[in-house]
Amino acid sequence: MFNVAVTFLVIRPTQMTQMWFGETGGVRDEVPSPSGATSHDTAVVMLAAGAGSRFEATVHKLFARLTATGPTILETSLRHAIESDVGPVFVVTGALDASALSADRQIAQLLDDPRIQLKHNPSWADGQAGSLRVATDAATAAGHDAIVVGLADQPFITPEGWRAVADGLGAITVATYDGRRGNPVKLHASVWGLLPASGDEGARVLMRRRPDLVVEVPCSGSPADIDTVEDLHQWQNN
């Protein structure tokens, strides 16, 4: 379930994120056992690698403010992820690198937090699968056995939502909002090898192939993403 713009990941009636709804790419044939899927060594992954080309404005959408004088989309998403206390936050960058993110004073201050680590995806333009691979490689190197993945342009996922999914008992745990699946999604290490090797999809194909691995967790807030200026205005007007 993922899809990105500056992919780092609600209270607004707009379209659901495409994060795990893609249909391209391949899934490997090995099937993990769902046993041992619970984890107390989990990292948050915020996908923030895309160009945000649908947001037609003078600034990248992650630097757009939710209100005239309020925080930016990225700042809000990051703060919610940090406040969840799930674990370290891996921010996968791409079109915007570390220097671009640090140009925003508030973001620069957040990036000084030792809980946040930037992981660059040099092949960000090839699709989301590469960003997920960067994330799982980083998690493996750090000794984590699960990641909870969301998008940087989803500022309405609450800290409580991040925690609820992190505490999920499935090899794959997915948030639901009024019965509809959305981000974030927790992926235990046992399924990392089954993620698409290429393309712009996340975990949707795997969830469809192995529904027995999936646990749904009802969450408050919203997984709505802000892809366009119209999305932002719609949220502001509601």
Predicted regions and their residues:
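Conserved beta-strand segments of alpha/beta enzyme cores
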Residues: 62, 115-117, 213-215
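Short beta-strand segments
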Residues: 47-49, 92, 150-151, 175-178, ...
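N-terminal glycine-rich phosphate-binding loop and ensuing alpha1 helix
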Residues: 34, 39-98
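Conserved alpha/beta core of the MobA/IspD/sugar-nucleotide pyrophosphorylase nucleotidyltransferase superfamily
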Residues: 11, 17-40, 198-238
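Acidic, Ala/Val/Gly-enriched low-complexity intrinsically disordered segments
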Residues: 4-6, 10
